Amino acid sequence: MNQSMDPKQEQRVWSRVMSAQAVRCTQEPEVCRRLEQKDIPVFDESAAMELYAAQCSAAMTYRCLAEMARGCARQALVRLAESRRCDGKRLSALYFVMTGLKACPERPKPPCVSCLNEALRQAYREERCTAELYSRYAANAGEYACTLEQLGENACKRAQELLNILQISL
């Protein structure tokens, strides 16, 4: 029994679907919203903890995306998750140097992903914004500037890798 919709009904359904997607697509990643502030951020203990928590969350996101992907895209996403985890460990070490305390952020919740390509797009944008944020932090970070610059370079490399994955999957 193959029932087809009349063209007007089909158009209404697609317009609802596309408008819902447009709302999701226009939401800026949290990191990008932080960049809207014009002042140069100061890298302190709270910034280190916040960045560490963001790295843990992104690593979880990449692991979840890897479960959805196939082939070389899956392998690349696993590498990206590992890269984020390693950068998180670096930030954890910086936090320990700054405070003498072990960084223990809340365990990140797995993301709700409905579309792999849209999630990759958001991850790409977040990596680009993360690279810019690290660059801004490095400008005022004193002894931690070199490490933050390296973390920013890592974010740029991850953004490029995400772009490569998108090229394959589209």
Positions of predicted regions on the chain:
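Non-heme di-metal
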Residues: N2-L170
